[in-house]
Amino acid sequence: MPLSSHSERLMGTTITISLADERADSLLQKSFDLLKELEYRFNANSQKSELMEINHQAGIAPVKVHPDLFELISLGLEHSLAPSSHLNISIGPLIQTWRIGFSDAKVAQPQEIESVLPLINPHSIELDSSVSTVFLKHKGMKIDLGCLAKGYSADKVAQFLREEGVTSALINLGGNILTIGKNQSRDNQPWQIGIQDPANPRGNHLMTIPVVNQSVVTSGIYERHLTVDGKDYHHIFDSQTGYPVETELASLTIISDKSVDGEIWTTRLFGERPASILWQVESLEGIEAILIDKEGHLSCSSGIPTL
């Protein structure tokens, strides 16, 4: 059966869903309706989003939130508090200071960075699961779920499509890929997912991997960056220093069953040395990694050849 596809610009990127089903038009419409609902819930750049209500009430009062938002913040907080984690959902003030990826991006001044660093503390996020409330203890704190929201949303769409009986689909949220089943438009073969060459324009791949019922999430310093006076500043920040993380990597790809896990581990591990990343990935069940350094060298975890 041929694939039916639909694309829209949401969550700051182009989202495309392709699926093989006689009800494709209706299922695609419902999938994008779900994505729009989730964007409204999680968007850190919309003054009207549910997440922004939490940020507006920082230092004032707890905010009761939708179960999806509470679940995602809880998950993000758990991984923000993990030892040596580079993921930090309280990084919002820093993201808003630099604005990399937006039209008003700028190099933050040292005094600006110094003023927001004390606010970037996940220990100051209070959750009450009995009433689904979130409270930011200090005025000026901001949660940013940009490192998790696309993966979580992809998983929600996949859950919906599976419940509807869809057996062949590809969900592409700006390069974050999640597959359902095999590609029915290609003789039911595994989906072939390209790994972007960081040194060349989008669509140039260093390798291609076969994927069935898995997610492929890539984080790279080439994705969004700002160049000022010949110096590049990328969008992956070190919440300890307030500056873009110093790294040997150009990109890190995580292959996992759930897309949100790919988002978690690309963020948690980006900033570690390549050898350390591979060592940690080998201890994680159901997680594989592909690393590309700034020199273009590629290294993979042990499960990649058998995928």
What do these predicted ranges mean?
Residues 1-307:
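Mature catalytic core of soluble alpha/beta enzymes
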